[in-house]
């Protein structure tokens, strides 16, 4: 885990010492508690019944904070300890040196003015490609942008702060959002090292929002935000058995992120439950003057997405299964679980339409990766220049994709050429330019494959509310990403004990499939139908209870709130 500087490390250490003294003073001065000993015992009893920090929800934490059972300071101290205990996973890249002072201020505000809402005092982690105006860096995991400060903060981070959320730190990621090379392991960055998955030793976390997913799985924060161009939220959510939500493009502002494609990038959430994702979305969605895509939100007021997360009835909902969009081995554990999931949805009252296929799926599958990447490469080439124009104190004078390539080649920390730059090099290929005819042809192809040739073709033909596919793989998520449609991944199951271990092809050959590793189910719908998506996902989650029944992360941190709170009271 990296701290921004020695002086900032001392500030954090000083803050911890200050809080230890403050806790001792509170213990010696009983009138500061404003409760009788009997009341304190009642509160402690309630706290002991609270789930582990690896399982507790945002809603539960908010309730305990409002009841006075715990404070935000307690939460920050506990999460910092857990982050230290889980350092081998390299999920958290950088701690906010001001986290404890922010927690004190939020606790005081709660006492004096009441709560701002469900996120008041809740510590969250932010992916290291999202700009924050504080003492945290934003570098996409690369030393090239270390010290390059954003002029303005991401609108999403600002709205989360306004809701009372506490930015605990930055998470590790696949460098440059996994837009560097073809032989670079997911979850690796020069600054953060190799993030590891939570469910099996030396396993891949997938990416690029790797640290955000692993942190939530291990209980290193209450929730986290990540970004997705294609599968960068959904895959790490799947491999770490958490909920990954990629909202509709334009529902959540995307300014202040280090881009791959401003046309396709979306900020989303990694949470323990679907309802937690809804709480986060309530405080992220909305119009921003800095993101013109949000100006086209089709409703005057942002819905209360939490209201969609209730009950177990799906009567009136039609769910389609596009079988031609994913591999179908009926004996695989994923497919066995998927077929059971379809029965669960039907038992809840949903009408399940099988073989609601994408009209042009076979044609789309024939396109090779580089042809598909022409659009992303062209947009990265343009959009990274735009982003770099918004930073100050740019110590390495990085102004364009060419500068990133040269920096990567020159600096040994970037581990070139062992870790290649194949995707970067696509930006230098002929015709890779947003003004080129080839680019515009590919954009039109994407609209067809995602629209009438894909998702819209299937949904309109069969009058569907939602599509459902197994795992985060297949072409469904790819087409949804190209169209800006919302997608949510929910835990579906775990590989059985007799599963043969499979490794990644690229070094360091992390474990990809193994006994007890998780997989997910994915729901897709049309733009700005996020509420329907959350409703279906919440019902499935409630009926299946996959994480309650299944294996747990193999090496969870040990610090818990109840222990820290009792220790504090005994100082």
Stretches found by the model and what they are:
Residues 2-111, 135, 340-351, 406, ...:
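An N-terminal boundary/leader segment
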Residues 120-265, 294-295, 322-324, 470-473:
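Short glycine/serine-rich loop/turn segments
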Residues 49, 120-141, 308-323, 374-451, ...:
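Short helix-loop capping/hinge segments that flank enzyme active sites or metal/cofactor-binding pockets
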Residues 76, 104, 154, 304, ...:
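Acyltransferase
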Residues 436-440, 444-493, 503-509:
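An extended, acidic, His-containing surface patch that forms the Zn2+-binding/catalytic region
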Residues 90, 222, 463-465:
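Conserved acidic residues
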Residues 60-67, 144-148, 265-272, 523-524:
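Short, well-ordered beta-strand elements within core beta-sheets of diverse protein domains
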Residues 85, 162, 166, 217-328, ...:
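Structural helix-boundary/capping segments
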